[in-house]
Amino acid sequence: MVLKVFKDHFGRGYEVYEKSYREKDSLSFFLTKEEEGKILVVAGEKAPEGLSFFKKQRAEGVSFFFCERNHENLEVLRKYFPDLKPVRAGLRASFGTGDRLGITTPAHVRALKDSGLFPIFAQQSVRENERTGRTWRDVLDDATWGVFQEGYSEGFGADADHVKRPEDLVSAAREGFTMFTIDPSDHVRNLSKLTEKERNEKFEEILRKERIDRIYLGKKYSVLGEKIEFDEKNLRDAALVYYDAIAHVDMMYQILKDETPDFDFEVSVDETETPTSPLFHIFVVEELRRRGVEFTNLALRFIGEWEKGIDYKGDLAQFEREIKMHAEIARMFEGYKISLHSGSDKFSVYPAFASATGGLFHVKTAGTSYLEAVKVISMVNPELFREIYRCTLDHFEEDRKSYHISADLSKVPEVEKVKDEDLPGLFEDINVRQLIHVTYGSVLKDASLKERLFKTLEQNEELFYETVAKHIKRHVDLLEG
């Protein structure tokens, strides 16, 4: 009834997102789109308390309040519809869909809504926010508007990813994030850079702080029939790599506990040069438990290469053997999931990963959704794509420094020589994928490129949503077997 009245009287100027329509307490809420952008419309006798609106019109006895999509109005929506507030994933199998543009969540909803995976629709790292100029509030609000637009009400999480500093942790907690991924990589030691003498000296320093040798030496474990025991050498090496990192994680955990009572806590130890051995995995878990750190997810450094935006590079059979060991350790200790970072496009490993973990997993993606967005640009606005491509070439060497990739610029095609209809095919080239993947910040800092990129995606919204949704669903289907 309300939508019909609205369309009859205002339909020419507004496109209604019908899936967004909700009713509560004699009020109707829905999203519309006009030439200037998206607008929240609230229909009822009077506006809800706290709602700000720029226009009020009546039709057939119904008052329509036209509102900006801002934080204050979203807070009003959250009061009426608590499912628009993020919640914990807990030990449910979960999937993170980072959105660097802030407009991609409707596609992510479509990919995940009928799956058995709990969605983390709001997920960005500190690094991503710095490069895109966004805040924790922007990330959570943008995702929530997308959830509202699609009429999704089954619950979602919000992950403050790769947090290193206490101030970033606190600000994300105060914005309502429900998951926090701690990156202690600045405190992880690289064993290959230490001589035997240096290793022994630094281990003695640790022992002067705490006699962990008395806790671990001689401790034995059996994992899938393999005997694992702490001896002086492997305990020394485990402590050298992880002891300080775990102390940092503990400090961050205590700060977070003072801010919010209930949250998912992910510990990321994947930023090491060498893969996490079963014994190192055991040491990390034992130390976290000993300190009272309650963690939901643990991200390990697996064998092989986990580069951004492309499939796994490595020995699949060896990975399968290792993930079975790690999954068994997780089952042995109980109470946490194994998390896969740089999870975008790792299609070849998903079946083995999901099977070994028995559904006790979390997978993170982010860059792949941005790649699909730029791919849509290549389909519908070839000249803009060529400008973006040239921008990525100009900034690649600087932007690549903080990413683990192997892209070779000598192997990327000259975009001027590629026909318009062949541009989308460039996204099959791993060098092009990584070129575009890591330079998003430089592209989005170019005001002209950013404005035209967003305008093009808005003008081709359904193609954009369906392209991203199809790609993310490919991940989901392989994880669900």
UniProtKB/Swiss-Prot annotation:
This chain's protein is named Tagaturonate/fructuronate epimerase
EC number(s) on file: 5.1.2.7
UniProt lineage: Bacteria, Thermotogati, Thermotogota, Thermotogae, Thermotogales
Q: Which HAMAP family match?
A: UxaE
User: What InterPro entries does this protein map onto?
Assistant: UxaE
Task: Kindly state which keywords UniProt assigns to this record, in alphabetical order.
Answer: Isomerase, Metal-binding
Q: Does the keyword Metal-binding apply?
A: yes
Family assignment from sequence similarity: Belongs to the UxaE family.
Task: Give the Pfam families listed for this entry.
Answer: UxaE
